[in-house]
From Swiss-Prot:
InterPro entries hit by this protein: UPF0756_TM
Protein name stated in the entry: UPF0756 membrane protein YeaL
Family: Belongs to the UPF0756 family.
Organism from which the protein derives: Escherichia coli O127:H6 (strain E2348/69 / EPEC)
Domain of life, source organism: Bacteria
Organism lineage: Bacteria, Pseudomonadati, Pseudomonadota, Gammaproteobacteria, Enterobacterales
Encoding gene per record: yeaL
Length: 148
């Protein structure tokens, strides 16, 4: 039996390799392995918890310099005194807010998820982006189409 989904995943993985984006390639290869093995029974759990776990891992990576001491407290304090750092703080707040709207939109309008995923994979693979795009993209879409 011909598996169109597997073919799409292989194509996206190839796109990841061609564009030298190991994040996309490895992620898709892991999903292919899950799909073609008995691990496929975990897909409902991955679909339900994967985003939360990914955000936790991303947050750990972002907070690691503070926890390790690489980013000293004095630097954090000075970030409130430099205009560029204040801009970075404001942008961080806005992007976090957009991500929150994105999570809501993805839950309430699942028909938009496919477009967001394709756009994110293309952005990661072709433009060396990072796969945090679906949440922010969904947040931007929510500003245009509404949360509903």
């Amino acid at each position: 039996m011909f598996d169109v989904t597997l073919l799409i995943l292989l194509g996206l993985a190839a796109l990841g390799f061609i564009s030298h984006n190991t994040t996309v390639a490895v992620s898709i290869l892991v999903l292919i392995i899950v799909r073609v093995t008995p691990l496929s029974t975990f897909f409902p759990w991955i679909e339900k918890q994967g985003l939360s776990i990914g955000i936790i891992i991303l947050t750990i990576g972002i907070m690691a310099p503070i926890a390790s001491g690489t980013l000293p407290p004095s630097t954090l304090i000075h970030s409130f005194l430099n205009w560029k750092s204040l801009v970075a703080i404001a942008v961080g707040v806005i992007v976090s807010w957009l991500g929150g709207r994105g999570v809501t939109l993805m839950g309430s309008q699942p028909q938009l998820v496919a477009g967001l995923l394709v756009g994110t994979v293309l952005g990661v693979a072709l433009f060396r982006g990072v796969p945090v795009g679906p949440l922010i993209a969904a947040g931007l879409v929510s500003l245009i189409v509404g949360k509903q």
